[in-house]
Amino acid sequence: MLLWLTNFLSQHFHAFRVFNYLTFRSIVSALTALILVLSLSPRLIKYLVSLQVGQMVRNDGPQTHLKKSGTPTMGGVLIIVAIVISVLLWGDLSNRFIWVILLVTVAFSAIGWMDDYRKIIRKNSKGLSARSKYLLQSIIGALAAVYLYFSATTGAETALVIPFLKNVLPNLGLFYIVLAYFVIVGSSNAVNLTDGLDGLALMPTVMIGAALGVFAYTTGNHFFAQYLAIPYIPGAGEVVVFCSALVGAGLGFLWYNTYPAQVFMGDVGSLGLGAALGVTAVVVRQELVYFLMGGIFVAETLSVILQVGYFKLSGGKRIFRMAPLHHHFELKGWPEPKVIVRFWIITFILVLCGLATLKLR
């Protein structure tokens, strides 16, 4: 939004030309989101407390979680709002990728909000039914995948980038839609499953969001794309503004969400942020690298699938003490902060491995 104004002003005042630089707009996008979340979170926490919007804790979970009961939740609304405001202010609103990512993020957050609202405000412990939630996610994910496929202007936009291999870009054809759908929907639910401890999902989301921003910048820059032997996608660089806003908003919220958390982001935050990472990975053609960098999300999801499947097949036996995986380690005696920080460290290592694929080809 401000880009249009600064473009006009730069014709008369040279100082405004700095706003034309993607790197500058990305930095101020992150700072805008960070300041918004840091400054508004205390008021939001007080407001949520006054509404008695408190987290409900499972009785069959780790006993250390019982003290979390009543902690304000649904704070993820502020993360999403800060991201949207920041991107609308500093992003190029003529860029189709920006709009797809924004709309998917907001739509999945709306699903999370409906689920939180039913569970916490309406006191319906089940929230949205699994079928209703998955149906809504599927519709949005499929629409985004179909749009990205049919709006593609180059073959690179629908090709599969295989890590560590140079100039190997198999065109997916219609299978692109299937892959994009599963990445978006799967990512949303994986982050949601991981969001069970204070800051556990948020810091990995921030780290992966920053890494995807690097991929977006290099993919959208003809010189760097050619130098690194990765596909060049015109317009993908603008996604850095979104990734920067996500990083800023995430870090701002983590100030209050870190152990012991003063507020939780709820499904409204985790579903939206997970979808944001998924659709961003699709846009910059890094689905496989995202699978690597999001190894914690993958492990958490697989632990649930394996636990449920084995429980049904074995007649009541379990692989893990409890799923998702972070609860298994808690029940083994790991203090919550140790689980959180170790998962962060693993994600940091995986993100570095993901970034290394830019050069190791």
From Swiss-Prot:
Native source species: Coxiella burnetii (strain RSA 493 / Nine Mile phase I)
Q: What is this protein called?
A: Phospho-N-acetylmuramoyl-pentapeptide-transferase
| Example GO molecular function | phospho-N-acetylmuramoyl-pentapeptide-transferase activity
Enzyme Commission number: 2.7.8.13
Where does it sit, as one GO cellular component term? plasma membrane
Give the EC class as a word. transferase
Q: Which UniProt keywords apply?
A: Cell cycle, Cell division, Cell inner membrane, Cell membrane, Cell shape, Cell wall biogenesis/degradation, Magnesium, Membrane, Metal-binding, Peptidoglycan synthesis, Transferase, Transmembrane, Transmembrane helix
Q: Could you tell me where this protein is found in the cell? A: Cell inner membrane
Q: In which pathway does it act?
A: Cell wall biogenesis; peptidoglycan biosynthesis
Q: How does it sit in the membrane?
A: Multi-pass membrane protein
Q: Which family does it belong to?
A: Belongs to the glycosyltransferase 4 family. MraY subfamily.
Got any disulfides in this one, which pairs? none
Cofactor(s) the protein needs: Mg(2+)
Q: What does this protein do?
A: Catalyzes the initial step of the lipid cycle reactions in the biosynthesis of the cell wall peptidoglycan: transfers peptidoglycan precursor phospho-MurNAc-pentapeptide from UDP-MurNAc-pentapeptide onto the lipid carrier undecaprenyl phosphate, yielding undecaprenyl-pyrophosphoryl-MurNAc-pentapeptide, known as lipid I.
Q: Does the keyword Nucleus apply?
A: no
A Gene Ontology annotation in the biological process aspect, one of them, is: cell wall organization
Catalytic activity annotated for this protein? UDP-N-acetyl-alpha-D-muramoyl-L-alanyl-gamma-D-glutamyl-meso-2,6-diaminopimeloyl-D-alanyl-D-alanine + di-trans,octa-cis-undecaprenyl phosphate = di-trans,octa-cis-undecaprenyl diphospho-N-acetyl-alpha-D-muramoyl-L-alanyl-D-glutamyl-meso-2,6-diaminopimeloyl-D-alanyl-D-alanine + UMP
Organism superkingdom: Bacteria
Residue ranges spanning the membrane: these are: 18-38, 73-93, 97-117, 135-155, 168-188, 196-216, 235-255, 263-283, 288-308, 338-358
> Is-annotated flag, keyword Isomerase?
no
